[in-house]
């Protein structure tokens, strides 16, 4: 029998599990306040669904051995979009859904072979809204969600914003392989690739300046207007960032616009965003999302409803940032029920049930204890529990 979990998998201790549950319940309360209904997408889906029309590479999906090509979900958006366009197709739009669950991603291990990453997520999806109002609601909801977590000031959260139309503007002068090469260099921030590429001097200068074009939305949009003139996407981003600026200031969240930012999965066809915080040793991504109209269209939605946007929060990194989550501790007193040889287990069980009836957590020592002092020492060793000593 193997005594180690599979590569990439991990065991969680009781406190970690309790903290995860507390975080997801806290987020769920916020989602419900905003009118979102809970759904539960399947963990196992057909590969065609999981790949989202080619937006997610098959190498990122944990495949199952089965007659049909099946896999474990690497994210939940594609599954929820499929359900929204099929079983939930008759529900009125806008349709607001939220879900919480485990996602699985496959990657190559350092020593070779497959490594499976298992992560807990909680997130929301908004279907049927074409205009920027969808993103305005979602990012306001993200801000409310982060506020509910009460992260410490040392985390220094930053909301990184991008837009696929900004990248299209940058790539518009290029075609074919050169376009792909420029895009790769920008996304991976590879200055050397840009400097050695066959480009006109002014093109190289523009691309290098765009690689440095990240910062406050107001400053970045001003630079982009200087390069590309007035564009509708600039007005949408201006409106969105104006809405977020007050809340971001109150919550000490830095807003950063990056025209070259593109997420890992190519699901998105509009606004994209990530919330990044300082971890204990390196920056960590706590949330990511964006607009994915093309995915909804592939799922069979009619043209007037083929709109979707959403985000997910990564529960495990959030848990690691909560150094001491007081709310994960029980509100009630923990009790150890112990009995002497003068009593018996049946009587001790009655005492335990009385504690439970009062809403208190109580655990039972199954063997008689020689003395009350020994029982008290046992209660302290198990976490300074209150002792209920049964001696008769």
Swiss-Prot record:
Pfam families: tRNA-synt_His
Compartmental location: Cytoplasm
PROSITE patterns cross-referenced by the UniProt entry: AA_TRNA_LIGASE_II (PS50862)
Record field: transmembrane: none
Statement: the UniProt record of this protein carries the keyword Cytoplasm: yes
GO cellular component terms given for this protein: cytoplasm
Quaternary structure and interacting proteins, as annotated: Heteromultimer composed of HisG and HisZ subunits.
Protein name per its UniProtKB record: ATP phosphoribosyltransferase regulatory subunit
Biological source species: Synechococcus sp. (strain CC9902)
Lineage: Bacteria, Bacillati, Cyanobacteriota, Cyanophyceae, Synechococcales
């Amino acid at each position: 029998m193997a005594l180690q979990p599979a590569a990439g998998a991990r065991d969680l201790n009781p406190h970690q599990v309790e903290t995860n549950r507390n975080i997801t319940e806290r987020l769920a309360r916020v989602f419900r306040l905003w009118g979102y209904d809970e759904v539960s997408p399947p963990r196992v889906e057909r590969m065609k669904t999981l790949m989202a029309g080619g937006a997610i590479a098959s190498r990122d999906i944990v495949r199952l051995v089965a007659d049909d090509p099946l896999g474990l979900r690497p994210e939940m958006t594609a599954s929820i979009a499929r359900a929204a366009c099929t079983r939930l197709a008759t529900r009125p739009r806008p349709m607001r859904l939220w879900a919480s669950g485990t996602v699985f991603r496959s990657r190559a291990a350092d020593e070779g072979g497959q490594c499976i990453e298992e992560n807990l997520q909680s997130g929301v999806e908004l279907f049927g809204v074409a205009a920027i109002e969808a993103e305005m609601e979602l990012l306001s909801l993200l801000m409310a969600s982060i506020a509910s977590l009460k992260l410490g000031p040392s985390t220094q959260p930053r909301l990184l914003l991008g837009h696929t139309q900004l990248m299209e503007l940058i790539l518009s002068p290029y075609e074919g392989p050169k376009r792909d090469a420029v895009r790769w260099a920008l996304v991976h921030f590879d200055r050397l690739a840009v400097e050695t590429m066959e480009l006109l001097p002014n093109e190289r200068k523009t691309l290098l300046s765009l690689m440095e074009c990240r910062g406050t939305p107001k400053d970045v949009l001003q630079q982009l207007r200087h390069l590309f003139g007035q564009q509708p996407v600039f007005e949408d981003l201006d409106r969105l960032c104006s809405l977020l600026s007050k809340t971001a200031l109150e919550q000490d969240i830095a807003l950063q616009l990056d025209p070259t930012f593109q997420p890992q999965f190519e699901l998105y066809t509009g606004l994209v965003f990530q919330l990044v915080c300082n971890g204990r040793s390196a920056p960590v991504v706590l949330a990511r999302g964006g607009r994915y109209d093309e995915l909804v269209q592939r799922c069979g939605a009619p043209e007037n409803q083929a709109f979707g946007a959403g985000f997910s929060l990564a529960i495990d990194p959030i848990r690691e940032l909560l150094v001491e989550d007081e709310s994960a501790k029980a509100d009630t007193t923990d009790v150890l029920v112990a009995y002497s040889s003068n009593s018996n287990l049946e009587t001790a069980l009655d005492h335990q049930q009385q504690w439970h009836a009062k809403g208190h957590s109580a655990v039972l020592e199954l063997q008689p204890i020689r003395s009350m002092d020994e029982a008290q020492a046992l209660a302290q060793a198990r976490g300074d529990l209150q002792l209920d000593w049964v001696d008769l």
